[in-house]
Amino acid sequence: YIGFGLRNWKGLDDALPEIAAAADYAYEKHGLTPVFVPIEFPSDLMPAERVGALLHCPWHAVRIRQPIETTIGILARMKTVVGIRLHSLMFSAGQGVPVVGMSYDIKVDGFLKYIGSRTCLQLSSVRADELCRLIDECVSGALDSEVHRTAEMLRDREQENVKGAAALLRLSGD
């Protein structure tokens, strides 16, 4: 499966056919069925349906709001995730899944830079051929060691945050 974490944003209309072409390519070349995994309900379902209407391959969408643990579990089972929605990228990277970002904002650029990802395109200029090249790179296994290091780093940072929060709670005395 190839996951997609989409959201409505300025510039998405022009990107929809490019995203659909890349999803069809992933199915034809790699046998990966597109799965649209919304983070925000119901707003993330609309771009999923719009891309789905352009596809020539089978596809699925998570149409019912899931607990966040289930959403993360679904993303963890993808071969790669293509995302506009920052949390789809964060959750996937944290589970060791290679990600392709389509950035609409500095926060997406910042996260992908933070994890050392080279697989980011600007939403305003997404082209299917570039998306397909990055999907190939993610699926090939060439990024596996980098992706595993990223997941380990994110888990370590999460533990540091938990320890920091616990220390702050102890300091508050309540």
Annotate each language-model stretch with its function:
Residues 1-174:
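Active-site anion-handling motifs in enzyme catalytic cores
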